[in-house]
UniProtKB/Swiss-Prot annotation:
One of its GO terms (molecular function) is phosphoribosylanthranilate isomerase activity. This is N-(5'-phosphoribosyl)anthranilate isomerase. The lineage of its organism: Bacteria, Bacillati, Cyanobacteriota, Cyanophyceae, Synechococcales. SUPFAM superfamilies: Ribulose-phoshate binding barrel. It is an enzyme of class 5 (isomerase). Belongs to the TrpF family. It catalyses: N-(5-phospho-beta-D-ribosyl)anthranilate = 1-(2-carboxyphenylamino)-1-deoxy-D-ribulose 5-phosphate. Gene3D superfamilies: Aldolase class I. Keywords: Amino-acid biosynthesis, Aromatic amino acid biosynthesis, Isomerase, Tryptophan biosynthesis. Pathway: Amino-acid biosynthesis; L-tryptophan biosynthesis; L-tryptophan from chorismate: step 3/5. The gene is trpF.
Length: 217
């Protein structure tokens, strides 16, 4: 399987289609009301329907933080195919959503400050399908532009696939992937004009950089 490429924080159907055209394997929707990239279930449904027609194999990922069952149900009904838990969810929370939504990919995101956080990430492998490592920020859950210490992550080899996030850009992606070998990458602020408004030139530059360095398979 080739490198998964997730572009997160979209709000516009045409941008979603254009980014899928460029080669994204997953599109992320922020379901956290405090985020400037927030989209409602109705907005997600509109984008999901557009993607289903043009790119049915592209994953549609809902990003949540400490969500209720009702919130998750609303976005599942809107057409997402993966649940990304980006808050303070526990192992028990993950198992509960795993049992409730067995057909959906379950991703647990962790904001990494130290090697202890990497050990915590590995503890989730029994109850999720995929892990995601993001940079820590005291006030923000994601889309901060802060990068991780890639060298410190080299020993991270969980039994589940994992995605690298945290300040990735078209300019630094090949450096990151020369040091690490995640199953996929997740970009948001690094390919934006403003929160929720993606810059298609930057997304194009991302794919050009990956292709130039033989990182697309």
């Amino acid at each position: 399987m080739g490198l998964r490429i997730k572009i997160c924080g979209l709000r516009d159907p045409q941008q979603a289609i254009a980014i899928a055209d460029l080669g994204a394997t997953a599109i992320g929707f922020i379901a956290v009301r405090q985020s400037p990239r927030y989209v409602s279930p109705a907005q997600v449904a509109e984008i999901a329907q557009a993607l289903q027609k043009t790119h049915p194999t592209v994953n549609r990922v809902g990003v949540f933080a400490n969500a209720t069952a009702e919130e998750l149900e609303a976005y599942v009904a809107a057409g997402i195919t993966s649940l990304q838990l980006h808050g303070d969810e526990t192992l028990a929370d993950c198992q509960r959503w795993r049992d409730r939504f067995p057909a959906l990919e379950l991703i647990k995101a962790l904001r990494i400050r130290s090697t202890a956080d990497l050990a915590l990430a590995e503890s989730f492998t029994d109850c999720v399908d995929t892990l995601l490592l993001d940079a820590y920020h005291p006030q923000m859950l994601g889309g901060t532009g802060a990068t991780l210490d890639w060298q410190a992550l080299q020993a991270f080899q969980p039994s589940r696939p994992w995605l690298l996030a945290g300040g990735l850009t078209p300019e630094n992606i090949t450096t990151a992937l020369s040091q690490l070998h995640p199953a996929g990458i997740d970009l948001s602020s690094g390919v934006e004009r403003s929160p929720g408004d993606k810059d298609l030139e930057k997304v194009t530059a991302l794919f050009s950089s990956l292709a130039r360095n033989s990182l697309l398979k």
